Amino acid sequence: ATTFSTHLPISNPFFELQYRISKMTPAEKAEWTPQIRALERADHKRGIPLTGVSKSLVSSLRDYVAALHPTWTMTDFKFQYVVEVAAQFKCSLLNLIQVVLGIKCQQATVFVSHAWRYNNKRFLSCVAGLKNADKEHFWIDALTVNQFHDTSTHDFTWWSDTFLKCIETIGKTTLVLFPYTNPIPLTRAWCLFEIFCTHHKNRDLDIVMDDRESRSFRSALATGDFDFNGWVAKIDLANAEAWKEEDKANILSVVKSKLKGG
């Protein structure tokens, strides 16, 4: 049996969602299924998933993860929470939340770029700690996108087009960055592609660190212990990593084709 922390209120929506799915009756499944399918069809008709998660919901997810799974990475969260909770409906987590919990989600206003190997609690703390963002709704891959898509139809072309169109439509990208000495996103091909898409479509890009990282970064800059120009010079898409080597090759090809002179 799972032992739940006393620091996690039972009213936490991510705890509640997990509990309600585990106790779901056939009648509830029959009631929820057509509603979820309607939301999924709307995403498909739109061509791109644009649902965002509110800052308060991000804070609730951070609290859930901090209390029960503090060592999870973003990848762990995807496979051990999202995929398990949404398995019976094969839908996005936000569409499931909207139907099962009745929490209305709005169109995203900020596209969040991050590394999948990030500690989930720390990543969510960065987003939840954003100032002047109480009215923002965040596009976060693991929550917004249906994680059950067939890879034969949702291949590189689908993902690259989705990122490009989402970034263009949403209008603002926030890149969560740490550690500052060698930020993981700047070594990942897909993250660099998202930065490129933001620049290519002339959209706003903000870089966000948590308080601890920001203090260390500012201190290193002030004391001259950090070579900013050298840091930037190391950013190289050709040397970046990707889960699939062919993705990296395709990303390089797309970027070169869109840049004048290659």
PLM ranges: what are they?
Residues 1-262:
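The feature represents the membrane-entry module of six-transmembrane cation channels
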